[in-house]
Amino acid sequence: MTINQNNSNHTFSSHNLDNSPHKINKLINKFSDYIWPIKRQELSKFLFITLLMFCILFIQNLIRALKDSIVTTMIGAETISFLKFWGVMPCAFLMTAIYVKLVNRMKAENIFYLIISIFLAFFALFAYVIFPNHEILHLSPTTAQNLIASLPNLKWFILLLSKWSFSLFYIIAELWPNVAFALLFWQFVNNITTVEESKRFYPLFGLLSQTGIYLAGQFLENLSHINEYVVAKFSLQASFHTLSVQIILTIVLILGIVGIKTFWLLNHKVLDKEHMALLRFKAKKKTMTIAESFQMILSSRHIRLIATLLICYGIAINLVEGPWKAAATKIYKTPTEYAAFIGNYLSYTGAFTILFVVLGSNIVRKLGWFTAAIITPIIVFTTGILFFAVNNFESSAGLIVASFILTDPALIAITIGAIQNVLSKSSKYTLFDSTKEMAYVPLDKEIKIKGKAAADVLGTKLGKSGSAFLQSLVFIILPSASYQSISVCLMFIFIITCLIWFWAVKELNKEYKKSVKFSQ
């Protein structure tokens, strides 16, 4: 009996030992699948899509920084609200109409090549022909000032038209994210990936996009050093700022060509014929009209509250962004200096967004929807109030003490404004977007589809365009006004907007709980 027991013990322990490596391997495989869920046979497809996305997003971040640098330092930060409402919005509608026509007449692959090539051709023309000769091409400062004196209420429109090439560059650069990324890239990727693949691919794409922001920021931060190196290496005679614009847009052109080549390889070498048969760019399904959107929002309190969140976010961010950019021009007076400043801001935005991505899912899972949803308005409100307090009352005793630390009082407002933008954008890309999408989940199918379309159309458009229109209206009525002079007024609108936002989150939480309970 004893021998048998010993034998059985020995057998049991041997069996345990045999199983241990198997269990460890299983755990390692599980962990590696969690960190890197891409299968071997999908690797080339994933890497090529990733490279294409990287090129498009890197371009997006470079031209976003460059357009702000040129317009704020060479025309004025106040003109941004005019460009957003009177320039970008009509051109976005025009671009959508052109795209619908192309979809009905051309092959999907050729649409991509045509649109990206037009963007790149304009950037090349701007870098090497328009910007170096902008003084010849633009209206003379004397003529512009004479026109402003005779038509003071149209001051900002005259400034934008007198420097038409800078305004045009801003509009084209603003169209890139909507056309190249949201439309061309995502339509292509959604057509060639299965639902099962998307669950594993898309989270990694999200992480990559933030890495792209960080790297673009680092490049812009070091722009002046790159500029100096290029001048020394090639003995160039071009002006410092012209060279900065040319360096940025040369990188844009190189990345654009790499992107086109990557797209071609995906179409002809990587994807099989079965995938290619699925590739058809589609004109968006008939979107709801503004009247239909209003009707949908008015019929559902749940959707009304989601739309309120989107409107409040858009207004609050734009109210702080304008005065912050205007304050930054006091210190960063040239396009090169301003681009380096924006680069620093982009680097921090990328790093903090990655942090929020890691923390975000845990906050929702452990603390619930309300806690995750209220974090973004709290961040926007506290940092925004701090910025306005510093910007409006920078002569107070506390700020004099702080100015010894930062050497220049104007830097205090700029630094707090940068912190406000970094934290607000980081939490928006993660917590705000995810909780907003979660709020649709418990609704019934019809309200979910139509309600989302209505809230996205009205909420996003009213948030961005509404804020830009209000600000441009103030500058039309008061042509001598600047962001500094109307900052106190903007602060009160900002406070009211954030209070409505807090109320909407609280009320939406009640609606969300009711809908979840009802759907179970």
From Swiss-Prot:
GO terms for molecular function: ATP binding; ATP:ADP antiporter activity. GO terms for cellular component: plasma membrane. The chain crosses the membrane at residues 43-63, 80-100, 111-131, 166-186, 201-221, 240-260, 305-325, 339-359, 370-390, 399-419, 462-482, 485-505. It is a multi-pass membrane protein. It is found in: Cell membrane. Keywords: ATP-binding, Cell membrane, Membrane, Nucleotide-binding, Transmembrane, Transmembrane helix, Transport. Pfam families: TLC. Belongs to the ADP/ATP translocase tlc family. Provides the rickettsial cell with host ATP in exchange for rickettsial ADP. This is an obligate exchange system. This energy acquiring activity is an important component of rickettsial parasitism. This is ADP,ATP carrier protein 4. It comes from Rickettsia bellii (strain RML369-C). The lineage of its organism: Bacteria, Pseudomonadati, Pseudomonadota, Alphaproteobacteria, Rickettsiales.
